[in-house]
């Protein structure tokens, strides 16, 4: 049992990780980032890279332990070309080739633009990046992103920052059935139980930001999510019992006599 869990690695392109919990950094005070990372036992942390905030980015990097893998995102990009420019900036800042593609042109619902994201995957892959596209769970778009060079697919569970949970559960399940890439649930997860449910489905990892950043005790909530992700993964590997009609767990005959 322990060996099975020990050998269970998250593989993204050429990278391997022991933790399947990815931590967002968008809403934390700088002082709390390090403690959240430690309690989450995360090995990957996302990082916004808008050109207007380069000074702030340098400060954030000072608070992230050196052994943590950075997953910069293209937050602020409204099209594929802007995503490429932000990705290039991230590489210039020394953040490596892993990049989370975020292309959002809708300021009301903040839904990712799948069409521009497909284009961004192709552009970034051609320049040697390892793209992880954030997307609205759609099979055709996911296939196109895979074919364009995506190393993993990051469908939203619910609108970003909403904490509504697995609203897109059925569509995420289709991606799990049909896409032979890591599926990382991103956006909308609001509680540890929801993260656990996602992992039980068989997703490769879960990314959480708002639900931890807005908790009363950020470090403790980060730990709660870490435990939930691990529990959900273990349940998936163990094999969940099928859902069915009522079945007696003990014999109902032969124990009462007239």
UniProtKB/Swiss-Prot annotation:
Places the protein is found = Cytoplasm
Q: Pfam families, per this entry?
A: ThiG (PF05690)
Question: Can you state the subunit structure given in the record?
Answer: Homotetramer. Forms heterodimers with either ThiH or ThiS.
Q: State what this protein does.
A: Catalyzes the rearrangement of 1-deoxy-D-xylulose 5-phosphate (DXP) to produce the thiazole phosphate moiety of thiamine. Sulfur is provided by the thiocarboxylate moiety of the carrier protein ThiS. In vitro, sulfur can be provided by H(2)S.
**Superkingdom, according to UniProt?**
Bacteria
Listed pathway(s): Cofactor biosynthesis; thiamine diphosphate biosynthesis
| Source species of the chain | Campylobacter jejuni (strain RM1221)
Q: What is this protein called?
A: Thiazole synthase
| Record family assignment | Belongs to the ThiG family.
Cited InterPro entries = Aldolase_TIM (IPR013785), Thiazole_synthase_ThiG (IPR033983), ThiG (IPR008867)
Q: Name one GO cellular component term.
A: cytoplasm
Arranged from A to Z, the UniProt key words for this protein are: Cytoplasm, Schiff base, Thiamine biosynthesis, Transferase
**Listed EC numbers:** 2.8.1.10
**In which broad location class does this protein mainly occur, judging by the first location in its UniProt entry?**
cytoplasm
| Reaction equation(s) it catalyzes | [ThiS sulfur-carrier protein]-C-terminal-Gly-aminoethanethioate + 2-iminoacetate + 1-deoxy-D-xylulose 5-phosphate = [ThiS sulfur-carrier protein]-C-terminal Gly-Gly + 2-[(2R,5Z)-2-carboxy-4-methylthiazol-5(2H)-ylidene]ethyl phosphate + 2 H2O + H(+)
């Amino acid at each position: 049992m322990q060996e099975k869990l020990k050998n269970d690695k998250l593989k993204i392109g050429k990278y391997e990780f022991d933790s399947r919990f990815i931590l967002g950094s968008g809403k934390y005070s700088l002082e709390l980032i390090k403690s959240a990372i430690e309690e989450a036992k995360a090995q990957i942390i996302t990082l916004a890279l808008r050109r207007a905030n380069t000074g702030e980015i340098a400060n954030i990097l000072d608070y992230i332990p050196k052994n943590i893998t950075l997953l910069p995102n293209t937050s602020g990009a409204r099209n594929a070309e802007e995503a490429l420019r932000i990705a290039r900036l991230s590489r210039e800042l020394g953040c490596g080739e892993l990049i989370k593609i975020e292309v959002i042109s809708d300021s009301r619902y903040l839904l990712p633009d799948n069409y521009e994201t497909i284009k961004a995957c192709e552009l970034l892959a051609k320049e040697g990046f390892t793209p992880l596209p954030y997307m609205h769970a759609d099979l055709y778009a996911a296939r196109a992103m895979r074919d364009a060079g995506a190393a993993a697919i990051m469908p939203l569970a619910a609108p970003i920052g909403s904490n509504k949970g697995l609203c897109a559960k059925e569509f995420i399940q289709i991606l799990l059935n049909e896409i032979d890439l890591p599926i990382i649930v991103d956006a909308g997860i609001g509680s540890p139980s929801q993260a656990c449910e996602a992992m039980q489905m068989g997703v490769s990892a879960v990314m959480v930001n708002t639900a931890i950043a807005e908790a009363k005790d950020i470090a403790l909530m980060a730990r709660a999510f870490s435990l939930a992700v691990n529990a959900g993964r273990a349940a998936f590997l163990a094999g969940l019992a099928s859902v069915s009609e009522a079945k007696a767990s003990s014999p109902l005959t032969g124990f009462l006599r007239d």
